[in-house]
Amino acid sequence: MSEKNIGRKNVEKRLIDSAAFLVSSVGPNQLTIRDIAYHAGVNHAQIHHYFGGKKGLLIATYKQLAFEHVQQLERRNISPTNLGDEPLSSITDDYFKAIIRAVLDDQMYLVRVQIDSGLSMSRETLNQLTKLKNQNKPTSEMKSAIAIAMVVEFGLSAMEEYINEVLEMTAKDKKVFMEYFYEVREHGINKVLSK
């Protein structure tokens, strides 16, 4: 690979990494190309040069976040029968927060990036559940079970610090809360699997 290509890939990676970090904290609407470039330590014109502008960079960023999310969950063998023993949002926190920010900012095209790229773990889990139940297409119960798991995962990602502060959660409280969390997260899927 030429030195020019190595330099380009390095700049692209720095821009995507910076955008991923920043978008999860301020959201796509408040994020500026100058903020991203400053954080990445590059000239803001490089965003236009490599990505065609902010929108192109955000699409690349959301695709990268989804890819990393899929990789992490695949490493843990996450499936409808094994949602793991930790909140999924704690594995790829930037992904969850970036998705929440895109939804709150009404930038649903960024949410669709994972779907259009074949990188939606929620869709993949729904497809796996459909196959496990020998169905041709997902039922309303299957979609609802996955939706409940999504709600509790995204809810925890968005609200954990708020919950801790308002309810003054102790270590014991958090332990009980997490037991309930796992129970709720898996309830709908287990109900579908048991039918």
Spans of model-derived segments:
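Hydrophobic alpha-helical connector segments
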Residues: 60, 68-104
